[in-house]
UniProtKB/Swiss-Prot annotation:
Family: Belongs to the IF-3 family.
Keyword Protein biosynthesis carried by entry: yes
Keyword match Cytoplasm: yes
Disordered, as annotated region: 1-20
Organism: Brucella melitensis biotype 1 (strain ATCC 23456 / CCUG 17765 / NCTC 10094 / 16M)
Cellular localization per UniProt: Cytoplasm
Gene Ontology cellular component annotations, sorted alphabetically: cytosol; membrane
Any one Gene Ontology BP term: ribosome disassembly
Function: IF-3 binds to the 30S ribosomal subunit and shifts the equilibrium between 70S ribosomes and their 50S and 30S subunits in favor of the free subunits, thus enhancing the availability of 30S subunits on which protein synthesis initiation begins.
Assembly mode: Monomer.
Protein name, as recorded: Translation initiation factor IF-3
UniProt GO molecular function: ribosome binding; translation initiation factor activity
Amino acid sequence: MRRPFRATPVQKDGPRSNRDIRVPRVQLIDAEGQNHGDVSIQEAMAMAEEAGLDLVEIVPNAEPPVCKIVDLGKLKYQNQKKAAEARKKQKTVEIKEIKMRPNIDTHDYEVKMKAAQRFFEEGDKVKVTLRFRGREMAHQELGMKLLQRVKEDTVEIAKVESEPKLEGRQMMMVLAPR
C-alpha cells in the first residue's frame, strides 16, 4: 500500500507578520516611527488594522520582539532593491593572463608590464605564463630569471600568490594586487 503524498510545508521568506507572530507581548513602533513601548499582540494587531497596514516583526530575537506597523509589500520590495544594489556593487575578481616567451624583447616586455599594471589597478589578479618552444626547454633558467624580473618590477603594486612553477612546457606565476 502506498503512503499518501504529503507536501513539504511552505517556508515563508522574510520577517513574520500579522497572525504569524506568536508572542503575547511586543514592543510596538507605529507607521510614523513612534515607539509605543510594550503592548499586547491583540492591541498591536488592532492598531495595524486601523491604519490599514501590516504588523511586521523587525527584531525577533529581542525581549519582547520589536514589531513595526508597515506595508509588508513595500518592505519586501525595499529589501529586494537593497539586495540587488549590494549584488551590483560586488566586484568579482578576475584572473587576467599575460603570455610571454623566455626570449622576449625589452619593448614587448614593457608593454606587457603596462598591461599588468592596468589589471592590478582594476583589482584583478594576473597570471603570467611563459611558454617554452622546442629547444628552449633546455634553458628553463632564462624563464625563471624572467619571472623573477616580473616579480621585482611589480613588488610595489602586487604580491605573489603562487610562486613560479613549471607545468609541461609552460612556467606560470599568479600575482594579486596589494
